[in-house]
């Protein structure tokens, strides 16, 4: 059975369990997971360019005459039937409605199965993990290639342009990009790039996407002399991250890595409330984050689940994409050409000192 049909059968099991007749899948991350492809046209809106309907006996997509040829040729699995409407028509009339129909998006009196669908896609398949490793390595390498050529006199938007160019050359588009030079790096935790000159430090964070799978990575470049105190602060952030990675154990609650971070910040000479200033990350895969973990999160860490932690403090940040396994975590977004050091037995990115 193909990867696509396996996922369809898993959704049919949800239908049987909840005594439903059909499912209407509408959200971008769930559609991308199902078809292992691109589901958007404009990249900055939630609405996908098609819907999927799954019943106990059939599965079909509903899209318009503009998108159908491309989707059938380049994105859809061969087993998927496609129902095509005129571009001026809406898709809703072809979608089943009522309480015996489940959906990942509210509306038309359908039953809510959003959580069940999210739980299905949190356990990545072997095929998905193989693709994900490639996405993560390619995104980290592209980010590194761009950052190795920037100058202290560049503007943040120049850096963002170089990163975007490097990503697209590796068939990766940008789901998120943050770039901060020295002037802004201690002020803002989500620094959308501006015309500000980067100066002697630049922190670049990306969420890069290919065929729905998203990789999160942060790398930092410094220019000129770096004080020992500054470097110790960076090592401190890596220490916080190490505590979180150690606490990321299949079956444990997502609150465990957050508890580890809360304890690790003051242990590494950060303010005891540093963790209040930014979320610490959470599960991901087909979104930059499915949701952010907190001290009150009781959901368990799943096997083969993608996660990105992102501790920050004093203008420093650590972030990479990992996959959980029953024998420990695997860091996916490694760039073998980037300077590295060993923290808690793991290879972690060093600063690129220019």
Language-model segments: which ranges?
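Active-site neighborhoods and metal-handling regions in enzymes and metal-associated proteins
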Residues: 1-354
């Amino acid at each position: 059975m193909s990867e696509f049909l396996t996922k369809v059968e898993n959704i049919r099991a949800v239908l049987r369990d909840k005594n439903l007749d059909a499912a209407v899948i509408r959200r971008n991350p769930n559609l991308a997971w199902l078809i292992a492809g691109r589901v958007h046209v404009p990249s900055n809106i939630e609405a996908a360019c098609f819907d999927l309907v799954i019943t106990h006996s059939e599965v079909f997509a509903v899209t318009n005459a503009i998108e159908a040829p491309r989707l059938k040729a380049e994105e859809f699995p061969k087993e998927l039937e496609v129902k095509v409407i005129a571009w001026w028509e809406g898709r809703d009339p072809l979608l089943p409605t009522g309480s015996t129909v489940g959906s990942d998006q509210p509306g038309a009196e359908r039953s809510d199965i959003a959580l069940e669908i999210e739980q299905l896609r949190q356990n990545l398949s072997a095929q998905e993990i193989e693709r994900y490793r490639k996405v993560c390595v390619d995104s980290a390498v592209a980010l590194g290639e761009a950052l190795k050529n920037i100058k202290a006199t560049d503007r943040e938007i120049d850096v963002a342009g170089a990163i975007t160019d490097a990503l697209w050359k590796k068939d990766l588009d940008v789901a998120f990009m943050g770039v901060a030079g020295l002037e802004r790096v201690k002020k803002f935790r989500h620094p959308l790039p501006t015309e500000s000159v980067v100066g002697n430090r630049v922190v670049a964070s990306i969420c890069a996407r290919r065929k729905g799978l998203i990789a999160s990575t942060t790398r930092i470049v410094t220019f000129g002399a770096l004080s020992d105190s500054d470097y110790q602060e960076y090592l401190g952030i890596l220490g916080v991250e190490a505590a979180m990675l150690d606490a990321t154990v299949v079956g444990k609650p997502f609150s465990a890595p957050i508890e580890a971070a809360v304890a690790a910040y003051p242990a590494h000479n950060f303010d005891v409330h540093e963790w209040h200033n930014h979320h610490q990350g959470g599960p991901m895969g087909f979104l930059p984050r499915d949701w952010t973990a907190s001290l009150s999160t009781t959901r368990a860490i799943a096997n083969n689940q993608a996660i990105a932690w992102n501790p920050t403090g004093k203008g420093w940040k650590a972030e990479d994409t990992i996959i959980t396994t029953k024998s420990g975590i695997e860091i996916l977004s490694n760039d073998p050409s980037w300077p590295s050091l060993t923290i808690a037995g793991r290879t972690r990115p060093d600063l690129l000192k220019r």
